[in-house]
Design a protein with these regions (language model features):
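N-terminal segment of the canonical double-stranded RNA-binding domain
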Residues: 2-83, 91, 99-103
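Catalytic phosphate/metal-binding cores of nucleic-acid and nucleotide-processing enzymes, i.e., regions
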Residues: 86
Length: 106
């Protein structure tokens, strides 16, 4: 994931925001408003909190995200930083939203 110099969100996240008709986000408050508007909920956990007896990478993160009634959970990828997990969760949720909207329109 390539992080922009301007803000917290990756280029991939900002590109999909543009495709969805939003401006790229400059801060967490803007993103929170977009997530709330689209009924997206994201939770980030330390891997060892979710899978305490696993051989997972220590101090890594996992995400759980929902978009409406659809649930996304990342069981196989471990993100080394909170920021990586957060961007991955947002990207997956917004990608799903984009696919849903384009399926209805196309």
């Amino acid at each position: 994931m390539k992080k922009t110099n301007k803000n917290y969100y990756t280029d991939e996240v900002n590109n999909i925001l543009i495709d969805l008709g939003y401006n790229p986000c400059q801060n967490k408050e803007e993103m929170d408003d977009i997530l709330k508007e689209n009924n997206i909920k994201i939770k980030i956990f330390k891997t060892e909190e979710v899978l305490p007896n696993s051989a997972k990478i220590p101090n890594s993160y996992m995400y759980f995200a929902t978009c409406g009634e659809d649930d996304f959970s990342e069981d196989f990828t471990e993100y080394i930083t909170f920021c990586e997990a957060y961007n991955a969760a947002i990207l997956e949720s917004l990608s799903y939203l984009w696919l849903t909207k384009n399926r209805k329109n196309g």
